[in-house]
């Protein structure tokens, strides 16, 4: 079987291997276990510097078709896009003609072009992993909405399984819940009650960017500390906000409360989650909130905003604490939970839910997508 992957992930070619964003490549290597050849249509980075977050495909037979990246964020970029889009469209058509199974990674500008191209192959087996927020009531770019509209339309999009995060009402028959995973079956642990009589350990794992709201996270912990609650916040991840966050911690005398570690190995984050009481992520938007699911896997109670499928993951508050993205309200909601909720029951429910979705199960689910029966 020849598997075609169309995605926006910028790749690096070095020493005959192709590298990309590690969580994406790690999953695509699972798809590769069941196919004879992989065809990738994606952009290539101009530099060949491999970052810690990059990983290589492990399949022996990979063909790569480079396409230009584009955006429509300015008049000049929109003008250039008019010349790039036809090139991408034709490249997608050629690659799709060669493939036995067409797999799109949405949302993204290149995948939008691919969404249109796949219409011309109604009889080929197809799948789409929609790695963004599928919530029909959320505020999203019109290009994302257009991709969702095309994918939902069973006349335009035939023979396609659309894999989305969470369960959503009133969807077309080709929209299917599909849960990503980080840990294997043999990494499961038994639930162990924790002592919530302080000090309380919180973990933030994510990019230090505006969308993840790391400033709000620190301010929540600061406010809890000022209320006399013994708390510690361990932050894993890097990004453009790191200098400002470090300065805020120093200026406000939080050096013994907030600890910024930057990017760390997966094993370091895992150990911290196993030891922590809470996992906090007050994001503006999420596709699959990976960090939340990872904490839940070890009985770490999630504290998160109800974006995307988070409310579904947290059982509308039975498996975690849902907060609003406003400081005083969020702090009040957390304090209420600390005083009134059965935290052990909440942590146990979080662990049991997340441990349903292992990497082993993900591999079986992928096999089911590739070899779906008519």
Task: Go through the PLM ranges and name each one.
Residues 96, 263-264, 271-276:
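Short alpha-helical donor nucleotide-sugar binding micro-motif in glycosyltransferases
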Residues 207-223, 229, 240-246:
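A conserved mid-protein helix/loop that constitutes part of the nucleotide-sugar donor-binding site
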Residues 254-257, 342-357, 368:
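A short, well-ordered alpha-helix in the C-terminal region of glycosyltransferases
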Residues 270, 289-297, 311-312:
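Short alpha-helical segment that forms part of, or immediately flanks, the ligand-binding pocket
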Residues 284:
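Aromatic "clamp/platform" in nucleotide-sugar-dependent glycosyltransferases that forms part
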Residues 301-304:
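Short hydrophobic beta-strand element within catalytic cores of glycosyltransferases
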């Amino acid at each position: 079987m020849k598997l075609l992957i169309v995605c926006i992930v910028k790749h690096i070619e070095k020493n005959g291997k192709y590298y990309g964003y590690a969580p994406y490549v790690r999953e695509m290597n699972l798809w590769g276990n069941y196919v004879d050849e992989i065809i990738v249509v994606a952009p290539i980075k101009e530099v060949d510097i491999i970052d810690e977050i990059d990983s290589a495909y492990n399949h022996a037979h990979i063909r790569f078709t480079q396409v230009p990246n584009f955006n429509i964020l300015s008049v000049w970029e929109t003008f250039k896009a008019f010349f790039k889009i036809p090139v991408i469209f034709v490249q997608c058509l050629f690659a799709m003609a060669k493939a036995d199974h067409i797999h799109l990674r949405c949302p993204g500008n290149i995948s939008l072009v691919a969404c249109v191209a796949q219409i011309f192959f109604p009889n080929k087996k197809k799948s789409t992993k929609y790695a963004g927020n599928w919530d029909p009531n959320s505020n999203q770019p019109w290009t994302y909405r257009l991709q969702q509209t095309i994918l939902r339309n069973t006349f335009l999009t035939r023979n396609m399984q659309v894999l989305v995060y969470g369960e959503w009402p009133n969807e077309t028959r080709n929209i299917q819940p599909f849960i990503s995973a980080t840990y294997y079956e043999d990494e499961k642990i038994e639930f162990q009650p924790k002592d919530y009589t302080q000090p309380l350990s919180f973990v933030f794992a994510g990019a230090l960017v505006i969308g993840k709201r790391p400033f709000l996270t620190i301010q929540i912990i600061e406010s809890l500390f000022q209320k006399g609650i013994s708390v510690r916040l361990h932050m894993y991840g890097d990004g453009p906000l790191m200098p400002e966050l470090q300065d805020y911690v120093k200026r406000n005398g939080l050096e013994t409360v907030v600890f910024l570690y930057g990017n760390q190995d997966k094993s370091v984050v895992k150990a911290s989650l196993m030891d922590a009481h809470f996992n906090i992520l007050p994001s503006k938007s999420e596709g699959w909130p990976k960090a939340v699911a990872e904490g839940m896997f070890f009985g770490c109670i999630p504290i998160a905003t109800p974006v995307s499928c988070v409310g579904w993951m947290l059982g509308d508050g039975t498996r975690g604490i849902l907060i609003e993205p406003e400081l005083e309200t969020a702090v009040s909601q957390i304090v209420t939970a600390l005083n009134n909720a059965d935290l052990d029951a909440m942590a146990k429910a979080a662990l049991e839910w997340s441990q349903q979705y292992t990497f082993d199960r993900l591999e079986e689910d992928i096999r089911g997508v590739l070899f779906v029966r008519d």
